[in-house]
Amino acid sequence: MLESLNFHFAFYDWLLVFMVTALGVFSAYTKDPQLKAVAATIPIPCGFAYIAVGLPMGAANAISGFMCLLYVHIVRILHYKVKIPIIPSIALGLAFFVTLGTLLMPIVPDTEAMFLGVCAFDFTVGVILFQKQKYKSGVRYKTPLPVYIKAPAIAGVVSGLMVIKHLMGGFCTSFPMMNSIVSYESRYSLGDQCRQLPLFLIAGPIMFIEMRYLETLLHLNHWIVLLCGYALFACIYWPLNQELKRRNERADASYSGEKK
Protein backbone atom coordinates (compact mmCIF):
# COMPACT_ATOMS: atom_id res chain seq x y z
CA MET A 1 0.00 0.00 0.00
CA LEU A 2 2.78 2.43 0.88
CA GLU A 3 4.47 1.70 -2.41
CA SER A 4 1.27 2.47 -4.32
CA LEU A 5 1.15 5.83 -2.56
CA ASN A 6 4.75 6.53 -3.62
CA PHE A 7 6.07 6.37 -0.03
CA HIS A 8 8.46 3.55 -0.97
CA PHE A 9 11.92 4.92 -1.78
CA ALA A 10 14.40 2.90 -3.82
CA PHE A 11 18.17 3.28 -3.45
CA TYR A 12 18.40 5.93 -6.17
CA ASP A 13 15.57 7.87 -4.57
CA TRP A 14 17.52 8.09 -1.32
CA LEU A 15 20.62 9.06 -3.29
CA LEU A 16 18.62 11.85 -4.91
CA VAL A 17 17.38 13.01 -1.50
CA PHE A 18 20.98 13.14 -0.27
CA MET A 19 22.26 15.08 -3.31
CA VAL A 20 19.43 17.64 -3.26
CA THR A 21 19.80 18.09 0.50
CA ALA A 22 23.55 18.66 0.11
CA LEU A 23 22.99 21.26 -2.61
CA GLY A 24 20.23 22.83 -0.52
CA VAL A 25 22.55 23.18 2.47
CA PHE A 26 25.18 24.70 0.16
CA SER A 27 22.68 27.27 -1.10
CA ALA A 28 21.54 28.06 2.45
CA TYR A 29 25.05 28.92 3.67
CA THR A 30 26.30 30.61 0.50
CA LYS A 31 25.92 34.39 0.59
CA ASP A 32 26.37 34.94 -3.15
CA PRO A 33 22.87 34.96 -4.71
CA GLN A 34 24.24 33.98 -8.10
CA LEU A 35 25.89 30.88 -6.64
CA LYS A 36 22.59 29.98 -5.02
CA ALA A 37 21.00 30.19 -8.47
CA VAL A 38 23.77 28.03 -9.94
CA ALA A 39 22.95 25.35 -7.36
CA ALA A 40 19.38 25.32 -8.67
CA THR A 41 20.34 24.88 -12.32
CA ILE A 42 23.22 22.40 -12.37
CA PRO A 43 21.65 19.09 -13.43
CA ILE A 44 22.84 16.88 -10.57
CA PRO A 45 19.30 16.34 -9.16
CA CYS A 46 18.00 16.08 -12.73
CA GLY A 47 20.58 13.40 -13.52
CA PHE A 48 19.95 11.31 -10.43
CA ALA A 49 16.20 11.55 -11.08
CA TYR A 50 16.91 10.22 -14.59
CA ILE A 51 18.72 7.24 -13.05
CA ALA A 52 15.93 6.69 -10.51
CA VAL A 53 13.09 6.91 -13.06
CA GLY A 54 14.86 4.68 -15.57
CA LEU A 55 13.23 6.28 -18.64
CA PRO A 56 15.11 7.60 -21.70
CA MET A 57 15.27 11.35 -22.08
CA GLY A 58 12.23 12.47 -24.03
CA ALA A 59 9.84 15.30 -24.76
CA ALA A 60 8.62 15.39 -21.15
CA ASN A 61 12.14 16.22 -19.94
CA ALA A 62 12.48 19.11 -22.36
CA ILE A 63 9.01 20.44 -21.54
CA SER A 64 9.68 20.29 -17.81
CA GLY A 65 12.81 22.39 -18.27
CA PHE A 66 10.64 25.20 -19.63
CA MET A 67 8.12 24.57 -16.84
CA CYS A 68 10.91 25.22 -14.32
CA LEU A 69 11.38 28.64 -15.90
CA LEU A 70 7.66 29.30 -15.47
CA TYR A 71 7.85 28.06 -11.88
CA VAL A 72 10.58 30.51 -10.79
CA HIS A 73 8.80 33.45 -12.41
CA ILE A 74 5.51 32.47 -10.78
CA VAL A 75 7.21 32.41 -7.37
CA ARG A 76 8.93 35.75 -8.06
CA ILE A 77 5.71 37.46 -9.17
CA LEU A 78 3.62 36.06 -6.32
CA HIS A 79 6.20 37.02 -3.69
CA TYR A 80 7.39 40.39 -5.02
CA LYS A 81 4.38 41.71 -6.92
CA VAL A 82 1.37 40.10 -5.22
CA LYS A 83 3.11 40.21 -1.80
CA ILE A 84 2.29 36.61 -0.92
CA PRO A 85 4.69 35.13 1.67
CA ILE A 86 7.48 33.04 0.20
CA ILE A 87 6.34 29.59 1.41
CA PRO A 88 2.79 29.87 -0.04
CA SER A 89 4.34 31.32 -3.22
CA ILE A 90 6.59 28.27 -3.54
CA ALA A 91 3.67 25.95 -2.81
CA LEU A 92 1.56 27.58 -5.52
CA GLY A 93 4.46 27.36 -7.98
CA LEU A 94 4.89 23.66 -7.22
CA ALA A 95 1.14 23.12 -7.53
CA PHE A 96 1.29 24.68 -11.00
CA PHE A 97 4.17 22.42 -12.02
CA VAL A 98 2.53 19.25 -10.68
CA THR A 99 -0.88 20.05 -12.17
CA LEU A 100 0.46 20.95 -15.59
CA GLY A 101 2.87 18.00 -15.63
CA THR A 102 0.15 15.55 -14.60
CA LEU A 103 -2.16 16.87 -17.33
CA LEU A 104 0.53 16.81 -20.02
CA MET A 105 2.08 13.43 -19.15
CA PRO A 106 -0.60 11.23 -20.79
CA ILE A 107 -1.02 13.40 -23.90
CA VAL A 108 2.54 14.43 -24.85
CA PRO A 109 3.70 12.10 -27.66
CA ASP A 110 7.21 10.75 -27.11
CA THR A 111 8.14 11.02 -30.77
CA GLU A 112 11.44 12.18 -32.23
CA ALA A 113 9.77 15.20 -33.83
CA MET A 114 8.14 16.26 -30.56
CA PHE A 115 11.34 15.77 -28.58
CA LEU A 116 13.56 17.69 -31.01
CA GLY A 117 10.92 20.38 -31.49
CA VAL A 118 10.61 21.06 -27.76
CA CYS A 119 14.41 21.04 -27.39
CA ALA A 120 14.66 23.63 -30.18
CA PHE A 121 11.94 25.71 -28.50
CA ASP A 122 13.72 25.60 -25.12
CA PHE A 123 17.05 26.54 -26.69
CA THR A 124 15.52 29.45 -28.60
CA VAL A 125 13.71 30.79 -25.52
CA GLY A 126 16.91 30.45 -23.48
CA VAL A 127 19.00 32.40 -26.00
CA ILE A 128 16.40 35.17 -26.35
CA LEU A 129 16.02 35.59 -22.58
CA PHE A 130 19.77 35.49 -22.03
CA GLN A 131 20.22 38.31 -24.53
CA LYS A 132 17.21 40.43 -23.58
CA GLN A 133 16.85 40.13 -19.78
CA LYS A 134 18.03 42.85 -17.41
CA TYR A 135 21.08 42.15 -15.29
CA LYS A 136 22.06 43.10 -11.77
CA SER A 137 23.44 41.41 -8.68
CA GLY A 138 21.02 40.40 -5.95
CA VAL A 139 21.07 40.67 -2.17
CA ARG A 140 23.74 38.67 -0.36
CA TYR A 141 22.22 36.53 2.38
CA LYS A 142 22.78 33.26 4.20
CA THR A 143 20.66 31.49 6.77
CA PRO A 144 21.32 32.30 10.45
CA LEU A 145 20.22 28.80 11.50
CA PRO A 146 22.86 26.28 12.60
CA VAL A 147 23.48 23.44 10.17
CA TYR A 148 22.19 20.77 12.57
CA ILE A 149 18.75 22.42 12.32
CA LYS A 150 18.87 23.54 8.69
CA ALA A 151 20.09 20.28 7.13
CA PRO A 152 17.37 18.03 8.63
CA ALA A 153 14.74 20.63 7.72
CA ILE A 154 15.89 20.64 4.09
CA ALA A 155 16.06 16.83 4.05
CA GLY A 156 12.49 16.65 5.33
CA VAL A 157 11.23 19.01 2.63
CA VAL A 158 13.08 17.10 -0.09
CA SER A 159 11.73 13.77 1.16
CA GLY A 160 8.21 15.19 1.04
CA LEU A 161 8.74 16.37 -2.54
CA MET A 162 10.00 12.91 -3.50
CA VAL A 163 6.61 11.40 -2.63
CA ILE A 164 5.16 12.70 -5.92
CA LYS A 165 8.12 11.55 -8.03
CA HIS A 166 6.47 8.55 -9.68
CA LEU A 167 3.33 10.55 -10.42
CA MET A 168 5.35 12.87 -12.64
CA GLY A 169 6.91 10.19 -14.86
CA GLY A 170 9.36 11.78 -17.29
CA PHE A 171 8.51 15.23 -15.91
CA CYS A 172 10.16 14.17 -12.64
CA THR A 173 13.70 14.67 -13.92
CA SER A 174 13.28 18.46 -13.99
CA PHE A 175 10.79 18.67 -11.11
CA PRO A 176 11.84 21.82 -9.20
CA MET A 177 12.99 20.15 -5.98
CA MET A 178 16.23 22.09 -5.95
CA ASN A 179 14.57 25.22 -7.31
CA SER A 180 12.02 25.15 -4.49
CA ILE A 181 14.79 25.01 -1.88
CA VAL A 182 16.74 27.79 -3.60
CA SER A 183 13.58 29.89 -3.99
CA TYR A 184 13.30 29.96 -0.22
CA GLU A 185 17.00 30.60 0.37
CA SER A 186 17.00 33.27 -2.37
CA ARG A 187 13.80 34.95 -1.26
CA TYR A 188 15.60 38.32 -1.14
CA SER A 189 17.07 37.86 -4.64
CA LEU A 190 14.66 35.80 -6.73
CA GLY A 191 15.71 37.79 -9.79
CA ASP A 192 19.06 35.97 -9.77
CA GLN A 193 17.28 32.64 -9.89
CA CYS A 194 15.15 33.81 -12.83
CA ARG A 195 18.20 35.14 -14.69
CA GLN A 196 19.99 31.80 -14.26
CA LEU A 197 17.28 29.58 -15.79
CA PRO A 198 17.96 30.64 -19.41
CA LEU A 199 21.40 29.05 -19.07
CA PHE A 200 19.73 25.72 -18.30
CA LEU A 201 17.37 26.19 -21.25
CA ILE A 202 20.38 26.66 -23.52
CA ALA A 203 22.59 23.85 -22.20
CA GLY A 204 19.90 21.43 -21.03
CA PRO A 205 18.29 20.55 -24.40
CA ILE A 206 21.68 19.79 -25.94
CA MET A 207 22.44 17.51 -22.98
CA PHE A 208 19.02 15.84 -23.35
CA ILE A 209 19.61 15.15 -27.06
CA GLU A 210 23.03 13.63 -26.43
CA MET A 211 21.73 11.47 -23.58
CA ARG A 212 18.68 10.25 -25.53
CA TYR A 213 20.67 9.03 -28.51
CA LEU A 214 23.54 7.59 -26.50
CA GLU A 215 20.94 5.46 -24.73
CA THR A 216 18.56 4.60 -27.57
CA LEU A 217 21.09 4.17 -30.38
CA LEU A 218 24.25 2.99 -28.62
CA HIS A 219 22.48 1.33 -25.66
CA LEU A 220 25.08 2.60 -23.21
CA ASN A 221 24.79 2.16 -19.46
CA HIS A 222 22.69 4.86 -17.76
CA TRP A 223 25.63 6.04 -15.67
CA ILE A 224 27.87 6.42 -18.73
CA VAL A 225 25.08 8.28 -20.51
CA LEU A 226 24.69 10.56 -17.50
CA LEU A 227 28.42 11.31 -17.24
CA CYS A 228 28.58 12.14 -20.94
CA GLY A 229 25.58 14.42 -20.50
CA TYR A 230 27.20 16.17 -17.55
CA ALA A 231 30.42 16.73 -19.49
CA LEU A 232 28.62 18.31 -22.44
CA PHE A 233 26.41 20.40 -20.16
CA ALA A 234 29.45 21.75 -18.28
CA CYS A 235 31.20 22.72 -21.53
CA ILE A 236 28.20 24.86 -22.49
CA TYR A 237 27.06 26.07 -19.08
CA TRP A 238 30.43 27.21 -17.68
CA PRO A 239 31.24 29.92 -20.28
CA LEU A 240 27.62 31.10 -20.24
CA ASN A 241 27.77 31.43 -16.46
CA GLN A 242 31.00 33.42 -16.68
CA GLU A 243 29.33 35.76 -19.17
CA LEU A 244 26.32 36.09 -16.86
CA LYS A 245 28.63 37.15 -14.03
CA ARG A 246 30.31 39.72 -16.28
CA ARG A 247 26.95 41.16 -17.31
CA ASN A 248 25.88 41.44 -13.68
CA GLU A 249 29.13 43.22 -12.85
CA ARG A 250 28.79 45.62 -15.78
CA ALA A 251 25.19 46.39 -14.82
CA ASP A 252 26.22 47.08 -11.23
CA ALA A 253 29.10 49.31 -12.38
CA SER A 254 26.79 51.23 -14.70
CA TYR A 255 24.23 51.69 -11.93
CA SER A 256 26.92 52.91 -9.52
CA GLY A 257 28.17 55.38 -12.14
CA GLU A 258 24.68 56.79 -12.65
CA LYS A 259 24.25 57.33 -8.90
CA LYS A 260 27.46 59.36 -8.81
Q: Where is each model-derived feature located?
A:
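N-terminal signal-anchor module of multipass membrane proteins
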Residues: 1-33, 37
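Structural signature of hydrophobic alpha-helical transmembrane segments
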Residues: 5-17, 51-70, 112-122, 165-176
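Membrane-interface helix-loop-helix junctions at boundaries between adjacent transmembrane segments
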Residues: 55-116
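A structural feature that tracks compact, well-ordered secondary-structure segments
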Residues: 24-42, 52-54, 157-177, 185-187
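C-terminal ends of transmembrane helices
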Residues: 21-31, 70-84, 127-137, 181-191, ...
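Cytoplasmic-side transmembrane-helix entry/capping segments in multi-pass membrane proteins
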Residues: 36-42, 83-95, 114-118, 139-149, ...
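Selected transmembrane alpha-helices and immediately adjacent juxtamembrane segments
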Residues: 132-168
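Hydrophobic alpha-helical transmembrane segments in multi-pass integral membrane proteins
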Residues: 101-109, 154-167, 206-223
